[in-house]
Amino acid sequence: MKEKSKNAGRTRREKENSEFYELAKLLPLPSAITSQSDKASIIRLTTSYLKMRIVFPEGLGESWGHVSRTTSLENVGRELGSHLLQTLDGFIFVVAPDGKILYISETASVHLGLSQEELTGNSIYEYIHPADHDEMTAVLTAHQPYHSHFVHEYEMERSFFLRMKCVLAKANAGLTCGGYKVIHCSGYLKIRQYSLDMSPFDGCYQNVGLVAVGHSLPPSAVTEIKLHSNMFMFRASLDMKLIFLDSRVAELTGYEPQDLIEKTLYHHVHSCDTFHLRCAHHLLLVKGQVTTKYYRFLAKQGGWVWVQSYATIVHNSRSSRPHCIVSVNYVLTDTEYKGLQLSLDQAASTKPSFTYNSPSNPVTENRRVGKSRVSRTKTKTRLSPYSQYPGFPTDRSESDQDSPWGGSPLTDSASPQLLEQCEGIESSCVYRQFSDPRSLCYGLPLTEDHHTSNELYSHPHSESCERGCCKAGRYFLGTPQPGREAWWGAARSVLPLPKSSPENGDSFEGVSPHIASIHSLQVRGHWDEDSAVSSAPDGGSASDSGDRFRADQCRSSPQEPSKIETLIRATQQMIKEEESRLQLRKLPTDVPLEPTNSLAKSFHSTDFPQSAMQSVVCRGPAQVISPAPSPVPLSRLSSPLPDRLSKGKDFLQNELSSSQLPLTGTCAVSPTPALYSLHPRQYLEKHAAYSLTSYALEHLYEADTFRGYSLGCSGSSHYDMTTHLRKAEQAPGHKGTSVIITNGS
């Protein structure tokens, strides 16, 4: 009996083993694996295989008993399937809703060191980091669709990162942390409607499983990856502030590495993609490696390029603490939407190539050492009050900071800022408050050197010229009065010279303002220091009242009466009294006014309507005639002490006298721009009506001086605006010619 029972048990086990071996042979696995599998493994693999048929009911076609109705293209895909798995830098896996691994490709052993047989049929939770269990559960959770009765089967995309157990040696494992390796998984959750029409399954859906591909992120030696032409690398701190960038970033995005260093990556990413980048950044800090979604990196010239980044946290070799982030970035497209500005950096890069700040000149800096301490005092840069115009530069020039008077209240708080492009034929000036700069009249182009060049450009006046009234003048002084009084008071647009000139070796402080009123022919050759610049009785400048300006900024506002308006009214009254005396003399009326200073005759007329003046902005090759033709405001002129007047005196004797022409004819003027000066500090001659001090004109000049001046005015009765052109002493950043518009008497 015992022998029979032993034989029966042995036979039963042999049959059982034989059935298991037969079952193992049916598994779609290599015989080398199935022949060494135990019974439990065979049962586990078989169960997984059967569940896979639920996920893919059509299976492999004919091999599962179904008639093949596939096209030739699908057959080619099946034939290439095994080869695709070998070339895939990752592995494919299918996970059931309960977490069981239904299938995993044999390439998983290359990345994890775990065999296909070992992983299949076991729970995925056994091979992932405990901190990732909740995330995996959320991935496997399905949601009911909104219109379930219209959909029989649908898929939900999934993309996530798992820290999976890795048993490879350190030399082959890449970057691992505590025996876990970061795997980027992407795939879809398959949802299908129940095939049973009976209750309670009618209209319900079942979660079939997750089908995904796992990719190993770049190993720790990211810097050893060969960077192709469409790749660049950067190193950043843990808060994504860029520390180092590869030089290829300039070719791909337009930004030089130094433009991006010390700036956060979020600053240069499209605002719609910052959320995805933030999520990737969070995963990177938690798991150590991440692959970002496709995001738009803003290009310097506008628009963006599509980028995907593979980021890794590098740990300190000694302390094993996170040290920095190293990212390899793949630029996937060319620049899209070029010219579309989405950030301030892009806007700054497309602004005109001019700036208020002149580049420092070493020669000028060396010569500036011996100057007074006051002239070298730097003041804090003031911000422009016109913040609603971000497209224009708001910084002030360096010479303005050097001025001992600082800036005047009107220039700092109310005057329109002038933009000047000092290079190129199309140099022009634009006011900020001019909504349409095209309405301005562009006349009288100036050549680079008017003494040698005869090339002038004609300008036909049109209706736009009539609309070009001087808004700046009306803003400061109100509506100008018609007639000669307006010409007398308003035709004094004075331009200061540049700050320094490397050629003559004189700095700005040693050059007196080249400002004068051209008198008649009888007194043309006589110049003295007082005729060039008005001086106060104490030897200082008549306009040396910067402290008083700063104390009366609010009162000097053009919105309420100020010293400017008071002095203008007094000056206009004085001019009217002088004209009453001038009317006693007969005016010659038969000789027209000839063009002066080598200007084309086409720009002059024989009469001028007694009406409100118009603003004429002249566009020339390298110079602008405007209310303030230089970005250097008039307040930067130094105090005209006697030792600073030699330069201006020589200039006035030699050049102004040589270019002045005798004027005869009727009360005719050329339509040269008669503009209000943008800056109130004008250093005029005897009739300086715009001197913004607390003195009246009687305080600045004696009675005999005014009497002599009145007699000189009675000698001739015509008015003239003589445009004197002079080659400017060019300083770095201020190129072009200097223009002085004066009126002679």
Curated annotation (Swiss-Prot):
GO terms for biological process: axon guidance; diencephalon development; dopaminergic neuron differentiation; hypothalamus cell differentiation; pronephric proximal tubule development; pronephros development; proximal straight tubule development; regulation of transcription by RNA polymerase II. Expressed in embryonic forebrain at the eleven somite stage. Detected in brain throughout embryonic development. Residues 1-53 form the bHLH domain. PROSITE patterns: BHLH, PAS, SIM_C. SUPFAM superfamilies: HLH, helix-loop-helix DNA-binding domain (SSF47459), PYP-like sensor domain (PAS domain) (SSF55785). It is found in: Nucleus. It comes from the Eukaryota. GO terms for molecular function: DNA-binding transcription factor activity, RNA polymerase II-specific; protein dimerization activity; RNA polymerase II transcription regulatory region sequence-specific DNA binding. Keywords: Developmental protein, Differentiation, DNA-binding, Neurogenesis, Nucleus, Repeat, Transcription, Transcription regulation. Residues 350-413, 529-563 are annotated as: Disordered. Residues 336-745 form the Single-minded C-terminal domain. Transcriptional factor that may have pleiotropic effects during embryogenesis and in the adult. This is Single-minded homolog 1-A. It comes from Danio rerio. The gene is sim1a.
